[in-house]
Amino acid sequence: MHSVSPSTYPSGGTSPAPADTPGTEYSEYEFSNDVAVVGMACRVAGGNHNPELLWQSLLSQKSAVGEIPEMRWEPYYRRDPRNAKELKKTTSRGYFLDRLEDFDCQFFGISPKEAEQMDPQQRVSLEVASEALEDAGIPAKSLSGSDTAVFWGVNSDDYSKLVLEDLPNVEAWMGIGTAYCGVPNRISYHLNLMGPSTAVDAACASSLVAVHHGVQAIRLGESQVAIVGGVNALCGPGLTRVLDKAGAISSDGSCKSFDDDAHGYARGEGAGALVLKSLHRALLDHDNVLAVIKGSAVAQDGKTNGIMAPNAKAQQLAARTALNVAGVDPSTVRYVEAHATSTPLGDPTEISAIAGVYGTNRPADDPCYIGSIKPNIGHLEAGAGVMGFIKAILTIQKGVLPPQANLTNLNSRIDWKTAGVKVVQEATPWPSSDPIRRAGVCSYGYGGTVSHAVIEEFNPILRPDPLDDGAATGPGLLLLSGPQEKRLALQAKTLREWMTADGKDNNLSEILTTLATRRDHHDYRAALVVDDHLDATQVLQALANGTDHSFTTQSRVLGADVSKDVVWVFSGHGAQWPDMGKQLIHNPVFFAAIQPLDELIQAEIGLSPIELLRTGDFESSDRVQILTYLMQIGLSAILQSNGITPQAVIGHSVGEIAASVVAGALTSAEGALIVTRRALLYRQVMGKGGMILVNLPSAETEEILGRRQDLVVAIDSSPSSCVVAGDKDIVAETAEAFKARGVKTFTVKSDIAFHSPTLNVLMDPLRDALGQALAPTVHIKLYSTALVDPRGQDVRDLEYWTGNMVNRVRLTSAIQAAVEDGYRLFLEVSTHPVVSHSINETLMDAGLEDFAVIPTLLRKKPTEKHILHSIAQLHCRGAEVNWAAQMPGRWATGLPTTTWMHKPIWRKIETAPLHTGLTHDVEKHTLLGQRIPVPGTDTFVYTSRLDNETKPFPGSHPLHGTEIVPAAGLINTFLKGTGGQMLQNVVLRVPVAINAPRSVQVVVQQDQVKVVSRLISSDPSLSDDDASWVTHTTAYWDRKVLGSADRIDLAAVKARLTTKLADNFSIDYLDKVGVSAMGFPWAVTEHYRDTKQMLARVDVNPAVLGDDPLPWDSSSWAPVLDAATSVGSTVFQTAALRMPAQIERVEIFTSEDPPKISYLFVEEASDSVPTSHVSVLSETGEVLAKFTAMRFSEIEGTPGVSGSMESLVHQIAWPPATPAEEPLLITKVILVSPDATARAQYAATLPTQVQSFQFSTTEDFFSNASSLPLEKGTVVAYIPGEVASLAEVPAASESFTWNLLELIKFIVNGSLPIKVFTLTSSVGDGQTPTALAQSPLIGLARIIASEHPDLGSLIDIEEPKIPLSTMRYIQGADVIRISDGIARVSRFRSLPRTKLRPASEGPRLLPRPDGTYLITGGLGILGLEVADFLVEKGARRLLLISRRALPPRRTWDQVSEDLQPTIAKIRLLESRGASVHVLPLDITKPDAVEQLSTALDRLSLPAVQGVVHAAGVLDNEMVLQTTRDAFNRVLAPKIAGALALHEVFPPKSVDFFVMFSSCGNLVGFTGQASYGSGNAFLDTLATHRARLGDSGAVAFQWTAWRGLGMGSSTDFINAELEAKGITDVTRDEAFAAWQHLAKYDIDHGVVLRSLAIDDGEPVPVPILNDIVVRRVSELSGSAQAAAGSSGNDAVPSSGPELKAYLDEKIRGCVAKVLQMTAEDVDSKAALADLGVDSVMTVTLRRQLQQTLKIPVPPTLTWSHPTVSHLVVWFAEKIGK
């Protein structure tokens, strides 16, 4: 790192190279041809994300070769099974970026949806180009609208092929998103550049050709700046396969340039970028010149032996042309970066060419050195040239020739002895004999392009002597910014780390200058006032931690539509304080501004005002006036010298004099005379007047005062206040009078009645004293507070200033005028804010929300720092600051560039395999694919492929979390496939699931028809033939044509069915029994029933699902049939989850298309099996279709239990508790706590009428119990202690829980009529070690309440005081949490939609193939099931931790019977491609952390990316029977094991940290005191980790798993579950819940289902109250009304509530369109900046209409470009 000094260099002229510099005589050369490289950046394999890291890799000869990430080729495995064979033969090794898919789309205002359609080459190029500009010290925004050029090498279209060949999912923006031109064009678009923007495809020479184009653009004057580079990304195997076949790829996947073993190259990926300027311009702009490009050339090698064969003569020609352009003698070039692709033909050819140019006539001891970067980072093809260029620059800069990597034996086909060139084989200092370091760079394309460039080091004599600013003196401003607020802390963290490491010795002022003048200032800003280097790191740390700091400002700039111009407001009397000028008079700018006025004023008053500032002697009003003016003049000078300029000014009272000076209406000397001579006259009236501030508007105050002249409104301060002035006695009386009216008044510290008729006597003397005409020109807008019209242009002459003394100060009018003119930023220029409050009031009264009022100084605060703080506040609100004026010195290079906030973005390809034939037409709602006759028979088969993308129904039809084809779809398939009108004996055997791709056949053989399928394997090693065919549904069909059927009298049926149901009865019924969604869109619009029959009017219009009409084949009977089978299942009196199992007969009586509106007549016909008949009727009653004897089977599960995920997975919410009508009597409180201070503190909060007793231990309490009043009205408050560290948690938890158990036992065994209240401290927040230590008490309290109801509660408090009111009024709750002063109780509720993760981010709790996944309890039943699930989801490496070890593998075939299932399971996992490691370790032991860490190192597995803590011990005992040892035997392992894992894998170190907890303590399972306590600890630990930023920390609070684990279902467990009103879950349901919770950012998930109860029946446990299903046979009128209005949010009518409601809804719509979270949508950001393009605008408009039910014009977002604007528009519409 170094600093760059400002310099000047004469325009034009020749290069002043020293006479003894060789090379300049090679040809005539003009200095104006020199092109400077002023910035560079790169991102390549091996974690080399910047040039400095790359340099270290070069020096250490690192080779970044590795295997291709598994995700890259995965779509090709799925697309066609034949690919697997080819991919196995394709080279999979190369040089790959760690996470090519990562992109910071928010930084660039690109939505995740659009980013997914962009080639990763565009994404990485955007980021690298931005980094290069930052490295150059060029703010990107400064280039907006400029002629800056972008030339970029690109020639890989892998991603384009990947996404565009997925035809069903092609989208509009994929064209530009995957085009070559999109790479440079995207950079130009983002930066708003107007210069050339061109993609260069010259194969492997592309990026060096791009550099050449950039050089040419600058030399020809097309562009002042050029951004050039190249990129390569390997997203598919196609080209690699081509190169394999051509023999160009190295078999071992590595480059070996110049080596005898070189037999092909290895492909690499990444990007590099350079920023170019003319050298002359770079010097004028004080840029850091990294290197100088002297010359470059591009040519073609003509017709060679083959188009891909190299040509040495052409390579030499290109090099000589570049040298000639450069005016450089080749003998002066010390190093050449060779192309060197490691091919047997290419390397010798290239070396001969280099030797022919650079090696000729060179002495053996003075060779030209050569090297190649490719063995380090691979061959980047289109990006290769620029990376070689970057290496050459680094070599010149560092003065070291880095050694060649992967070099063992020099290529024997090259004559090295006579070549005159030498490969660098060890790090070699650049020869000191070279007067200037020069290098050449070669790059060639396999199509024949040859390119060459010549560069040299920057000659420092071109720059004048550097200016040495020296160490920073005094405080300075450190600026950070980002497009989103969350970036500020990250940027602060990155900068602090750099300043304490690489940048620890750098000049602070240079760092500040760089951040202020050489970096962009985004909308979210932070400005830190710092004293020195150490202070800067500390303040940065505070910002990174989210800690407030007194001199740190952080805010968003004012909205895009709001003016950022600043109004300076100069306040009047009242801001003074004794030391206000003592520091400032040492400021040279301040002193220079006031010093000329000192002599003038001293001549008038006989005293030096500067001396008065030194002494702080200005108690009298006349001195205050003079010094107020002087301070304001000095402060104005300081502000202006710091780059702050007012666009308008306002003066308040005496402040109007300084305001006029700044505006140009007065000179500072004239202002000094006015204020001084006026102050001298004030001596005549000092001590006679008084002033008070009145909390009433001026008009109302005037009305009260009447027409009095001795008492007037002197100052109109704000819309709600004014100042009254007059005789001091009258003012005092008036204050009392106002007080009597209930009006607040405040005395103003003044003994003069300013701005009142009292001063009329001074007007003539003032005219005489001033005695001269003043008629200046105003050059800054000046609002008057002395005139009725604040915009009045009255000349500031003698009359004006005379009137100013006595006229009312109309501050409110002046501020209102400024607001009307668009101003929103106000700076009070004073020594303490006097009018800021009034300005704020006025702005708020105007209905403004986006504004700022900023003080310049604060009383008794450091003046220099506070002035900077005010500038910081202005900057952070968007004011223009001339930072160059404030920081004109040197700037520093090497500061960290933008810290990206990456998210993985990769287009998921769902295209069906090519081998499956034609796919069925989903719009016809059948499974009929390609029709294939069977030769020689009348049999034919329809073949197709079924998966989630080809499901033949538009909605969703899940059963226990698995999507299945509805029965209606299968019946429709049979009808369409046979062409018949009648089906008989339809048997629905096995549901057709679509959770995995499957081949489907519909077989029609004579009069039989069936649907069969088999799974398509995702394992490349398995053939589809290995899967078995499954028969799903069978039927017989009849060819006869049915005639018309009977007609049913609808009116008679309606009259007979007297009970009218709610329209949504069937949907609600189905949802409650587990059918959470419908496969087809239909809605019931009328519904009637009696005990055995139903009549329902059904609408099957596809628009039911939304505004977009679905693709719909009008001949499909499936939607009507779906309504029939669904409504037909709801006729039965008992609720259960039922599916059609058999239908005796299906008949269609019409050849016309099914109706959109029909009636369903349902008759129950049950015998031993639930059965119904369903007729489909026209609106006139004609029978169109009929289901006869549709028999239903009850699905495994519990009647009355909803099957949807929403009914399975819950959060714990904390709604306010309902107070009891009769309070609990509490007269005495016994405090038990080991903390004496806490006892005293809590006792002090009790009212005097409540007696208290204090004990330090339970034993102390028990021993004194006989002397205590243990009677009704007495309660025990148990207050556990606090802990300071995690190390103390296990012991403390054990102590706290056992103390509580002892208290309970004592009270129960003694039959004492007292209650126990346990008071924990903010356990719910989970932030502190104390919270963790106390958390087991939560679980214990719930179990105690279950076993001993009404014995008291646990109350989690937020303040250290006895919550007496809560103890008295909140009764019957086991655990109470006090939050925001409100007592709350726990309830299960649906997962909050606000926590739903954006679809683009994907789920968070699932594995990836490159990680290791650790499971404790790994050999247990649940542990192995978790392992199976993780492998199913892609995990390839498992580490199973268990207390027991497995025998050696060689003995596995002879293990005991009890181990055989475990061994078999592990072998099954391994057969599916997983590597399974078993680690015998007791995770609860004290040395577990050390043992686990050692084992992980020893195993050398890939990093652990996920942890599942599934270990545990269960030992049920009732509270009264448990012993301390037994209790601790369960609790200690839970806590110790979890803490051990927490220490080894701290927050954010793994993708997920899952802990298996239990719902037992939540619903109060008896006997689980210890188990429940331990699980409550796990729950809080998850919260603790989440508070530390770990988004993958989750505690699953499971119900029992059916047949599995410690809580597996048994008769006892089932009885306990039923008693608590819940059910168990199956293994599949459990993991479906896991995947559902993975979609949410939440630290816990309660997994259980509630049993249905009859309406009016009490809930088994209160926590279930909000999720329990209540059975209702029919709805009352009120219930129907409620049902009719359900689903609509209560919309506030007006005011802030409406705006908040609209803001939430509109941000939600925008987030849905952009596929991001609503929290990430900035209401004040332009929608276009967020990524909403013209296509998305259409979708957004539709979303807004659907959500807010208001027609939206197509042009709305044109005139309302932000969410805030849209809120205003919709608010107006709703208001009307």
From Swiss-Prot:
Residues bearing O-(pantetheine 4'-phosphoryl)serine are 1734
Q: Where is this region: Product template (PT) domain?
A: 1205-1657
Give the Low complexity compositional bias ranges.
1-18
Q: Where is this region: N-terminal hotdog fold?
A: 925-1044
Renumbered residue ranges of the record's region Disordered: 1-26
**Triggers of expression:** Expression is correlated with the production of patulin. Expression is positively regulated by the secondary metabolism regulator laeA. Expression is strongly decreased with increased sucrose concentrations. This decrease is lost in the presence of malic acid. Expression is increased with pH changes from 2.5 to 3.5 in the presence of a limiting concentration of sucrose, 50 mM. Natural phenols present in apple fruits such as chlorogenic acid or the flavonoid epicatechin modulate patulin biosynthesis.
Cite the source lineage: Eukaryota, Fungi, Dikarya, Ascomycota, Pezizomycotina
The protein, known as = 6-methylsalicylic acid synthase
Please provide the record's keywords in A-Z order. Cytoplasm, Multifunctional enzyme, NADP, Phosphopantetheine, Phosphoprotein, Transferase
